Amino acid sequence: MSTFFLKQAQIEKQWIVVDATDAVVGRLAAFVSTILRGKTKPTYTPHMDCGDNVIVVNASKVKFSGSKMSDKVYYRHTGYPGGIKSTTPAKILRGKKPCEVVKLAVKRMLDDGPMARRRLKNLYVYAGPEHRHEAQKPSIVEFASLNRKNRR
């Protein structure tokens, strides 16, 4: 019997909604990245994008464990000499794009390369409780009730 490899036509993507209210960012990102990779499915194939589409709502209400909310530092570079910029999660969550904390955490949980960039396009993060994917009939996953450590 030969090893089963999934074909592109056999992939069935589902839509999953995860509520991030009071969720610990690292645990949420690990859970979402596992779904995006397709590791929760028995038909997982490493070289195919067989993961589901994930919608994260209430991303502005995430929590960090310990004192990471003020001590953790995100760096970026403008491209100019001496152009390194830094910010903290507290500043990002109070700013215009609070979803970036969750997106960046999930991005760093995925591998590097073209497949990870393709999988990251299946992630939709919203700061509030509303999303615009009701037509896809997403299933709701109670992330906070999976483990007592998932909430703060």
UniProtKB/Swiss-Prot annotation:
UniProt cross-references to Pfam families, sorted A to Z: Ribosomal_L13
Gene Ontology biological process terms in this record: negative regulation of translation; translation
GO CC terms: cytosolic large ribosomal subunit
Transmembrane segments: none
InterPro entries for this protein: Ribosomal_uL13, Ribosomal_uL13_bac-type, Ribosomal_uL13_sf
Domain of life: Bacteria
Assigned keywords, A-Z: Ribonucleoprotein, Ribosomal protein
Signal peptide: none
GO molecular function: mRNA binding; structural constituent of ribosome
HAMAP family xrefs: Ribosomal_uL13
Assembly and interaction partners: Part of the 50S ribosomal subunit.
Family, per entry: Belongs to the universal ribosomal protein uL13 family.
Described purpose of this protein according to its UniProt entry: This protein is one of the early assembly proteins of the 50S ribosomal subunit, although it is not seen to bind rRNA by itself. It is important during the early stages of 50S assembly.
PANTHER family linked: LARGE RIBOSOMAL SUBUNIT PROTEIN UL13M, RIBOSOMAL PROTEIN L13
Name of this chain's protein: Large ribosomal subunit protein uL13
